[in-house]
């Protein structure tokens, strides 16, 4: 999540003024967060609230209203401020810009389960060693 947010902030000044170099400052005073950061935070809240469809809709509308000038596309902005909870036929790539947390949430189990098994084995062995020392 932090990587996505940092990337959004560092890239903010180049969003409409693309550059073709890897030589650019990491820290500038004119950097700012965009709608992608706001909606990434909304996705995080939605996942923490259960990760169901309504959780995502509620969080996106909430965060969109909290940060109305973050740079949303016209259709998304209209959707945020409407009572409509259905898809709004976006032509943009915004959903791709904030989906990283969904993959991270899914990969947690893939990553943790093998590590937990290994950790249990290590702790078991340490416990056996400690018992032998006592």
Placement of each model-derived feature along the sequence:
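Structured, active/binding-site neighborhoods that engage oxygen-rich ligands
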Residues: 1-134
């Amino acid at each position: 999540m932090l990587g996505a947010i940092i990337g959004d902030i560092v890239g903010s000044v180049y969003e409409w003024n693309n550059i073709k170099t890897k030589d650019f400052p990491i820290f500038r005073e004119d950097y700012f967060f965009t709608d992608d950061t706001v909606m990434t935070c909304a996705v995080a809240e939605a996942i923490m609230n259960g990760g169901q469809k309504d959780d995502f809709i509620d969080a996106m509308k909430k965060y969109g209203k909290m940060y109305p000038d973050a740079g949303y596309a016209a259709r998304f902005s209209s959707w945020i401020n409407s009572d409509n909870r259905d898809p709004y036929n976006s032509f943009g790539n915004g959903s791709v810009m904030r989906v990283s947390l969904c993959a991270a949430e899914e990969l947690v189990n893939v990553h943790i389960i093998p590590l937990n098994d290994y950790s249990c084995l290590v702790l078991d062995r340490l416990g056996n060693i400690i018992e032998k020392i006592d």
